[in-house]
Amino acid sequence: MNTSHPANLPRRLLLGAALSAVVVAIAACGGGNDDNGATAAARNVLYVVSNHPTPGQNSILGYTRAADGSLTPLPGSPFLTGGKGHNNPTAGLLGPNDLDQPMVASKDKKRLYAVNAGSNTIAVFNVATDGTLAAVPGSPFPSEGRNPVSVEIAGNRLYVVNKNEDADQLPNAELPNYTGFTIESDGRLTPIANSTIPVVKNGSPTQVLASRDDKLIFGADFFAPAVQPGIGSLRSFRVNADGTLAQAPGSPLALPAGPVPPPPLPLGLYLHPTQNILYAGFVTRNQLGVYTYDAVSGALTFVRAVANSGKEICWVRTNASGARLYTVNNIDASVSFYDNTNPLQPAERQKLTLKELGPMFLNDRGADSFLQVTSTPFQPALDPSEKFIYVISQRADATHPAVTEGNKLHILSIAADGTVSQPGAPLNLPVPPSARPMGLVVF
């Protein structure tokens, strides 16, 4: 029998072939993807918030990533956000730039959200397959407060921290806050009624962070004078069905007082990827704080603080399994690697000092003053392959016009044992000396 002729093929085979052809055609047209405009998620890209303090000039710096971790600017970069960054005309003042997650990507990597910290708005972009960005209609959107510094996605909602420490907007009578938005299908942000949680004046909230199931929100108030003078606090909230936030039992929770000053100030919250554990940098104590949390109530329990050999541990990240943990230590410009096999007792194994740190300047904190490097590291990000860590550095001394460099991006290599090295020089970021670039998103 000649089975190659269509008339001789069984009807079910013909039907199967036809259905397969339809599926292929739909896939080729992108019909199986989300509705935010991209046919496939971008890969091998990196984004930085320029935090440009000139009105209308804040932007997202976009790069493609090569196999060796090196970076090449994306076509069209920088991508304007429609707003301005915040201003910090000081020499390393605590507070204004103490923040985390000023930019976040959707889980499908097709949309990007970033703060305009100096114009009180949130920029929203669609991410094309090639990594280029296009603002969604109506972007940027009011942040419902002053000086937004941190954003987080929880399901179809976006939560924001408004810090209210932008020098160009002080003094004012508004309070810092945590607040929420509904993310509409086209990316627009709609404020959630009654979702705003005010923070005490000068409380300096730094971050908003969602649990794995999006049912809890965590935050850190860097200064929390209403909780306990001179000691920061952590917050946890349950996310209600309507998107409003309910304080968890014991929240806000003052950080544990130690035997000697200085008091602990919290920064750089990060969740263990598989267990109910929260990590926090105790900045002025040079310690890594370890907490557990109740998955239902959100209540936090302090476990311990482990030593960090750097100076002012500020940002924390783990790898995908949670077995490795990395911290950025701000004042001595170092990165620490911890063996996190026991996630309740991380053990520091290495500290690496970054390259090209610039001249020293006096960070004037009165009796606690010290010399600090000009190019000071801030937020880190691991790439998906876990072969590289990117660390952003800012020109931290804004009081000396002659010192114009310091805004850089460091590329660290991760060895098989988790230790890090810096084979090459950092990348100079194309921002003016007055800018304090911040935040990294890496696909």
Label every PLM stretch briefly.
Residues N2-T3, G16-N44:
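Bacterial Sec-dependent N-terminal signal peptides
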Residues H52-G56, S119-T121, N164-Q169, F223-V227, ...:
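Short glycine/acidic-enriched loop and turn motifs that connect beta-strands
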Residues Y63-L71, V124-L133, G180-L189, S236-A246, ...:
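Short loop/turn segments immediately following beta-strands, especially the blade-tip
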Residues L71-G83, L133-P142, L189-V199, L245-L255, ...:
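Beta-propeller fold detector
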Residues T81-A105, P142-G155, P198-D214, L255-I277, ...:
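Beta-rich, blade/repeat-based domains predominating
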Residues L133-S211:
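Asp-box/WD-like beta-propeller blade repeats and closely related beta-sheet repeat scaffolds
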Residues A402-F443:
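Blade-level signature of beta-propeller repeat domains, shared across WD40, Kelch, NHL, RCC1
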